[in-house]
Structures are given as structure tokens and as C-alpha cells.
Regions:
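Core segments of cupin and vicinal oxygen chelate
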Residues: 30-69
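Long, hydrophobic N-terminal alpha-helical segment
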Residues: 14, 18-33, 38
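Short beta-strand/turn micro-motifs at beta-sheet edges
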Residues: 15-18, 75-79
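Short, charged/polar, Gly/Pro-enriched secondary-structure boundary elements
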Residues: 66-70, 77, 136
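Vicinal oxygen chelate
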Residues: 1-19, 25-34, 62, 79-105, 108-146
Length: 146
């Protein structure tokens, strides 16, 4: 992947390519929730994610070969202000699934507060934003073919 930062790596004082950690990918990300068991049910029921297992504090989930963890945080605070989507988690769907996904959200009375199909230069496609049961911002996206 190309370095898209404005500062070339060679210009960062004290950092050379040999100093970089060579990661292979992302194993999982973590989403803070008030009740990880209830949240696991939401993600399984609404987004068809697979529940792997739960402990006293965590629920481990899988979606399309990627993993995420729902962490019980009793005093969870939404990282976004109302109506904002800067901090969010995007779930990809196929083209024929996008409209069906929108209908599922509507049928479940889950409000989509933002929709766009134009103007996204990095990930062009159809994007819809909504909240999980804890107010975390989620996105469903169909990426246009390149």
C-alpha cells in the first residue's frame, strides 16, 4: 500500500523503513458497549455476524472472515456527538444486499441518519450510517467495482 501521508517516511526524523513493524493485517478491533451479551445479539440479529464466544466481559464476533470484540464498559460514552459519524465501524455488503439491508434497518426501526452514494473518494460506493443498541456509529457499504 502506498504511503498517502503528507510526510514521506524518509523525512520523519529518526524513522527509517527498517525501523517499521511489518504487520500482516488486523486481527480484530474492539467496540465498547454497556452490555456485551445484548450487543452480541444485536450484531448477530441485525448484521448476521457470528458469535464465537463470550466471557464475563467480552463477546467475540466474526463477520466475513474478520473479527471484532464487544467489550463491556459499564460507563460507555459514545465517541461521536449526535449526528456525527467520524468514529464508526463499516460492514461491507454486496450490491444486491444493500437495498435489502436498508429495508431490514427500516423494518427494525433502526434509523439511518446519513446516506450517500457520491463524493467518497477513498471508498466509492453506497454508504448508510446508523447506530447500534449502545449508540456506536455503524456503516453498511457497497463498494463500487474498480
Amino acid at each position: 500500500m502506498e504511503n498517502t501521508m503528507n510526510v514521506p517516511i524518509r523525512d520523519v526524523p529518526g524513522v527509517t523503513p527498517k525501523d517499521q513493524i511489518r504487520t500482516k493485517g488486523i486481527l480484530h478491533f474492539t467496540i465498547g458497549v454497556r452490555d456485551h451479551i445484548a450487543a452480541a445479539k444485536f450484531y448477530a440479529d441485525v448484521l448476521s455476524c457470528n458469535h464465537i464466544r463470550s466471557s464475563d466481559r467480552y463477546s467475540f464476533m466474526e463477520c466475513g472472515g474478520s473479527f471484532f470484540v464487544l467489550a463491556k464498559i459499564p460507563h460507555h460514552v459514545n465517541p461521536n456527538n449526535p449526528g456525527e459519524d467520524a468514529h464508526h465501524h463499516a460492514f461491507m455488503v454486496d450490491e444486491d444486499e444493500f437495498d435489502r439491508a436498508m429495508a431490514v434497518l427500516k423494518a427494525r426501526n433502526i434509523e439511518t441518519f446519513k446516506y450517500t452514494s457520491e463524493g467518497h473518494h477513498t471508498f466509492p460506493g453506497r454508504h448508510a450510517y446508523f447506530h447500534d443498541s449502545d449508540g456506536n456509529c455503524l456503516e453498511i457499504v457497497y463498494l463500487y467495482p474498480k
